[in-house]
Amino acid sequence: MTASSSDACDPHAEARMASNAHLPAARMAEVVREYGPYPGAPAVHGVSHDGDRVWAATAAGLLAIDPASGEVQRTLPCAADAGTAFDGRHLYQIGDSQIQKIDPQSGRVVGTIPAPSGQGSDSGLTWAEGSLWVGQYRDRRIVQIDPETGAVRRTIESNRFVTGVTWVDGELWHGTWEGDESELRRVDPADGAVIERLALPANVGVSGLESDGAGLFYCGGGNSGKVRAVRRPKQA
């Protein structure tokens, strides 16, 4: 993911400010808890939630974290350099330009498909509506793919790097991280228009995003090695 830098040293900062001018005003995100860093896991590349545990993609593989205690309950060794997803039965993990389908009980890889970019720019990953949704940070887009074949079903464009993606209650959210600025954005799945923005504190990156299906988002924290729980806004 993108390394932190100040806007004074960022040649794209002015362009980002211009592209954000027509967007809804950002509100500050409410970070309610931080987890980690954990031994042997200096960076978090993706996150998911299986209804009970938070899964974090790290150099050590997938860590299953108890969200109440913050303790690591299990580690599944696998290539894990980007997004993570859960379909109710299997985990999906981006690693080495592939998406691995993993049995969380045994840790066995039961299938693989090519990651859509094939160039290491796939980042966020989530499961919804019978599809995998892949954030592509360099290409600034989200692609919906067939989980069996990897075929692209549709593409949603963004004006920012996409570093995490999740669906919750019919809402599509994605994480962004450019320079020292990170946000969580709710977007219209029909055309990608930004509906809502939550700004993370300066120098807090987002590398992976998932909802717990209730009141929280979980965000990977890149090279901080942390996972952060962020309050999900209540909708009217």
Name what the model sees in each region.
Residues 206-236:
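Blade-level signature of beta-propeller repeat domains, shared across WD40, Kelch, NHL, RCC1
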Residues 17-41:
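A short helix->beta-strand "capping" segment at the edge of beta-propeller domains
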Residues 30-38, 71-76, 108-115, 151-156, ...:
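A short beta-strand motif characteristic of beta-propeller blades
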Residues 66-70, 103-107, 146-150, 188-192, ...:
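Short loop/turn segments that connect beta-strands within beta-propeller blades
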Residues 63-64, 100, 143, 185, ...:
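WD40 beta-propeller blade core
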Residues 55-60, 91-97, 134-139, 174-179, ...:
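Conserved beta-strand positions in repeat-built beta-propeller and related beta-rich domains
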Residues 38-51, 78-88, 116-129, 159-170, ...:
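Beta-rich, blade/repeat-based domains predominating
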Residues 162-168, 174-183:
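Loop/turn-rich, solvent-exposed surfaces of beta-rich toroidal or solenoidal domains
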